[in-house]
């Protein structure tokens, strides 16, 4: 049934499927055409190559073909089917390889030639199936034969000096025809034109010389091997009548002309030009009996040492001279001779022979495939056929049906060329030598077939991998494979789309995680561990200064600060890992929660009594500067000791609690003070017309009546990097010159206090001058006094620059309480000098709170000098506070109630205005402490130590006393 009948039957049947359903007609046709596409006509993949029978092993001729159904392979010899009846000569393997065995020989050349002719010839491979037949190209089988016996052996010869010598040699029969070479004394004999030449297979010596004596041997060589003849002994003897030549002095020879006879090169075994010599004889003597021509080639004009070649001339006045080479410069001269006598040489003439094209092609031209190229190599033609100097070679690539013709020129003595092979096919090359006259005779064409990858892999089993790749490529080109791949790809994309859809539908979007704003992570930190944030604890900073309760302007509007807490985009650096309970947390006053959450105390602190004498040793560098101003604000000075009732020294207490120097991002850093202790005291007048005056003496207080003042006591905690012994070893600095004077004898003015340091090794005590007001005033009176006249001169820019200092701390509850108690009437002035002098700057206005500048205080002091009954002694002016934050500005909104002496309403207004939007740093804690101090409330924390314990402890409740 043909293909058309099958299609008709399929259409008539309606495309019934396996399940009895009708399939679409195009799908049925696709399957039918796919099945038919499997059948293909035969195609030769591996062509047979030329083989040479040599040795005892068989020769192999390979032939591979593809097709569906699998084609049948048969071999043809010289166009006739090869008979496989004699397996000893021909054997066909299952894969199509033909084995050719060497037939046995009988020793006679004629019989051997007849036997070998039965297997020698051109072999062709033929592959056929029901779709067609494919024929490979022909491959020639040759047999290399070289018999053992020489037909003519050289014989021993004895020659006389000056005579010619001939050694004959007949090489053995062989195929290919063997070449003959002569050896003398075990070395190749060097041939010289005109002296030693090879004619046929015989060696000819024109004029025998003594150095020609030796052992000569003839050697025959072909592909089958080489054969050596017997050694022949050649002896050169002197003639019996040999005598010295006599000089003919009376004869003179004049060489007149040297003429080239044959301008065209002569093809043959003796190529070379010939010249005609003409000379003239003069002299009284009779003419000479014979003449000899002497010539030599002059390759270099500076070369004068080459030997002369002698040739006997036949004529008496002219003669023909041969044995020359084209393209050489020769020197010629003639010598007369008569028997044993000879005359002087004639003059020398020069003749330049022109170059001719080489008379022989290059030898041993071969082709071999490379990596995408074809390598052509050859050997130069024989020296006698150069006909000049070889200047290069011309290479021709013969064109065919698939490749165009091309040619290349190789310059110099290079004897190989690489030709790029752009496509597979047959490459045939010819090579010719080039001289100054042009290209010579080209060589016979040499061909090379470049096969495709599939053919090479099938012929060479080692390249089976590349052939498999070609098969895979051909398979992937089939339509059914392409259709199946497209369907699989579509299904894969559909599955990926479904997975992505389901994941997006059920997926959980991750939030920003721990990357929060600065204020948010601070609040979250205090919620997680609020034991490190005090609520009106020993980290509160007291504030003092004149307050203006009549103004209602906002602090933020004065300082140009946005009252809102800016939420910057910086990511928090807070570590959320659980912290060790042994590592305490430092107070954070930069946020709302850090300012409101108080640390628990083990016992309520004890307020120091104003009557208690205070003596503290100050470092020497406090007195080394003349500036009375400290480097930080007096209200926010260095932190004092946590509890005056601690049994341990400051450094030991910190070590006992494992207090470490920890710095939290965007939190208050741990302050390292440069002084172990600081005592600040300053007094502010209650009336605008009264100012402070200088003290008459360092140890006396003014007996005059002075307004109520706020005295702030501060004691700096132990430094983390210094032990208590180092701090205790520092001497007490001398009293500043501005504080020295006549001591006062007023008992009420002797207000020197001696404080006991909370350490096992107390510091040496030294008396300090203390001011004692003769007229005590209430806390409200002292704090609600009229602001100082110099408080309006402090600028916010100077305060902003002071805010960058990190050497400030806060007041302890004891200091706040002491400040409140001393404000009634007893004032404890202290002396502290900043290690770094700072220029005076305008005052800063905290809404209703203002601080006088150094210049203002100085003016007040000068003005108060004349009114000694109203002012006290100002030992240490206050330090400037940093620039207020929006929280402090917002605090001013609740100050109006306090100005009307309505304490409950002021507290309510103050607390209600303290929201999280502006309570974001420690400045609000300072301002709130001022407000609490002004109302006269005392703060008693429940725990006196400074170590923050309990990571998840709840914050203590607020206590207002």
Curated annotation (Swiss-Prot):
GO terms of molecular function: signaling receptor activity
Q: How does it assemble?
A: Interacts with SLIT2 and ENAH.
Q: Which residues form the signal peptide?
A: 1-37
A Pfam family found in this protein is: Ig_3
Residue ranges annotated for the Ig-like C2-type domain, each copy included:
42-142, 148-235
Similarity comment: Belongs to the immunoglobulin superfamily. ROBO family.
Gene3D superfamilies linked: Immunoglobulins
- Quick one: where's region Disordered? 544-563, 600-634, 726-810
* GO terms (BP aspect): angiogenesis; blood vessel endothelial cell migration; establishment of endothelial barrier; negative regulation of blood vessel endothelial cell migration
Q: Which organism is it from?
A: Rattus norvegicus
SUPFAM superfamilies annotated for this entry? Answer: Fibronectin type III, Immunoglobulin
Please state what the protein is called: Roundabout homolog 4
Extent of Polar residues compositional bias: 623-634, 770-783
Where are residues bearing Phosphoserine located in the sequence? 823
State the disulfide connectivity.
Answer: 63-125, 169-218
Its biological function? Receptor for Slit proteins, at least for SLIT2, and seems to be involved in angiogenesis and vascular patterning. May mediate the inhibition of primary endothelial cell migration by Slit proteins. Involved in the maintenance of endothelial barrier organization and function.
């Amino acid at each position: 049934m043909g293909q058309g009948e099958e299609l008709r039957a399929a259409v008539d049947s309606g495309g019934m499927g396996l399940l009895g359903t009708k399939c679409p007609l195009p799908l049925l046709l696709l399957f039918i055409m796919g099945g038919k596409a499997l059948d293909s006509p035969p195609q030769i993949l591996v062509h047979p190559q030329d083989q040479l029978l040599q040795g005892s092993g068989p020769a192999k001729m390979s032939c591979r073909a593809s097709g569906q159904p699998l084609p049948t392979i048969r071999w043809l010899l010289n166009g006739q089917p090869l008979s496989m009846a004699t397996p000893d000569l021909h054997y066909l393997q299952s894969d199509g390889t033909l084995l050719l065995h060497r037939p046995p020989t009988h020793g006679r050349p004629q019989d051997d030639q007849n036997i070998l002719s039965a297997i020698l010839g051109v072999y062709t491979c033929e592959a056929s199936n029901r779709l067609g037949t494919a024929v490979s190209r022909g491959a020639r089988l040759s047999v290399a034969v070289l018999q053992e016996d020489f037909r003519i052996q050289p014989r021993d010869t004895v020659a006389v000096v000056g005579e010619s010598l001939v050694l004959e040699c007949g090489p053995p029969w062989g195929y290919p025809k063997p070449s003959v070479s002569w050896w003398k004394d075990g070395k190749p004999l060097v041939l010289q034109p005109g002296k030693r030449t090879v004619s046929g297979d015989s060696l000819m010596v024109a004029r025998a010389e003594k150095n020609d004596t030796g052992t000569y041997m003839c050697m025959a060589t072909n592909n089958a091997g080489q054969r050596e003849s017997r050694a022949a002994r050649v002896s050169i003897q002197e003639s019996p009548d040999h005598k010295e030549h006599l000089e003919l002095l009376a004869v003179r020879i004049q060489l007149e002309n040297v003429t080239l006879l044959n301008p065209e090169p002569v093809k043959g075994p003796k190529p070379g030009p010939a010249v005609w010599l003409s000379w003239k004889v003069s002299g009284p003597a009779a003419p000479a009996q014979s003449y000899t021509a002497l010539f030599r080639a002059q390759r270099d004009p500076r070369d004068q040492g080459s030997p002369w070649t002698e040739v006997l001339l036949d004529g008496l006045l002219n003669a023909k001279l041969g044995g020359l080479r084209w393209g050489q410069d020769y020197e010629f001269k003639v010598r007369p001779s008569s028997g044993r006598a000879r005359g002087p040489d004639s003059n020398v003439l020069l003749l330049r022979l022109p170059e001719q094209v080489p008379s022989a092609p290059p030898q041993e031209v071969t082709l071999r495939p490379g990596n995408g190229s074809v390598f052509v190599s050859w050997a130069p033609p024989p020296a006698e056929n150069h006909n000049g100097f070889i200047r290069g070679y011309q290479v021709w690539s013969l064109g065919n049906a698939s490749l165009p013709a091309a040619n290349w020129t190789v310059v110099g003595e290079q004897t190989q060329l690489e030709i790029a092979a752009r496509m597979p096919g047959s490459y045939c090359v010819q090579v010719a030598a080039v001289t100054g006259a042009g290209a010579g005779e080209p060589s016979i064409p040499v061909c090379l077939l470049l096969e495709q990858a599939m053919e090479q892999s099938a012929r060479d089993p080692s390249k089976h991998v590349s052939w498999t790749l070609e098969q895979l490529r051909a398979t992937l080109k089939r339509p059914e494979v392409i259709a199946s791949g497209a369907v699989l790809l579509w299904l894969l994309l559909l599955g990926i789309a479904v997975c992505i859809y389901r994941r997006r539908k059920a997926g959980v979007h991750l939030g920003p995680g721990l990357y929060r704003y600065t204020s948010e992570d601070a609040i979250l930190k205090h919620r997680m561990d609020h034991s490190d944030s005090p609520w009106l604890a020993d980290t509160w900073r007291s504030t003092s200064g004149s307050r203006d309760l009549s103004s209602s302007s906002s602090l933020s509007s004065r300082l140009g600060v946005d009252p809102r807490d800016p939420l910057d985009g910086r990511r928090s650096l807070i570590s959320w890992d659980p912290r060790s309970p042994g590592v305490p947390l430092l107070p954070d006053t930069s946020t709302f929660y850090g300012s409101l959450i108080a640390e628990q105390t083990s016992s309520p602190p004890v307020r120091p009594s104003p009557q208690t004498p205070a003596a503290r040793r100050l470092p020497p560098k406090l007195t080394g500067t003349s500036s009375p101003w400290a480097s930080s604000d007096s209200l926010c000075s260095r932190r004092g000791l946590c509890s005056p009732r601690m049994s341990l020294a400051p450094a030991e207490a910190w070590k006992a609690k494992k207090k470490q120097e920890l710095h939290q991002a965007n939190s208050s850093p741990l302050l390292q003070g440069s002084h172990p202790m600081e005592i600040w005291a300053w007094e502010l007048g209650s009336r605008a017309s009264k100012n402070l005056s200088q003290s008459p003496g360092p140890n006396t207080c003014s007996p005059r009546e002075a307004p109520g003042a706020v005295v702030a006591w501060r004691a700096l905690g132990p430094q983390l990097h210094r032990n208590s012994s180092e701090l205790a070893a520092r001497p007490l600095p001398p009293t500043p010159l501005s504080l020295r004077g006549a001591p006062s004898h007023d008992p009420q003015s002797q207000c020197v206090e001696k404080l006991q340091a909370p350490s096992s090794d107390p510091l040496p005590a030294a008396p300090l001058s203390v001011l004692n007001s003769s007229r005590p005033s209430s806390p409200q009176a002292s704090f609600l006094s009229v602001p100082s006249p110099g408080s309006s001169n402090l600028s916010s820019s100077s305060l902003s620059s002071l805010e960058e200092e990190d050497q400030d701390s806060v007041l302890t509850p004891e200091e706040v309480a002491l400040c409140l108690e001393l404000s009634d009437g007893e004032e404890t002035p202290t002396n502290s000098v900043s290690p770094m002098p700072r220029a005076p700057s305008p005052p800063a206005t905290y809404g209703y709170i203002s601080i006088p500048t150094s210049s203002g205080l100085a003016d007040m002091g000068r003005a108060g000098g004349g009114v000694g009954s109203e002012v006290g002694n100002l030992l240490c002016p206050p330090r400037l506070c940093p620039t207020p934050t929006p929280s402090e500005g917002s605090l001013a909104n609740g100050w109006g109630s306090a100005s009307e002496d309505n304490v409950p309403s002021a507290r309510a207004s103050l607390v209600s205005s303290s929201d999280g939007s502006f309570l974001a740093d420690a400045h609000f804690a300072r301002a709130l402490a001022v407000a609490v101090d002004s109302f006269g409330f005392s703060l008693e924390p429940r725990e006196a130590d400074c170590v923050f314990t309990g990571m998840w402890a709840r914050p203590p409740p607020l206590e207002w006393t």
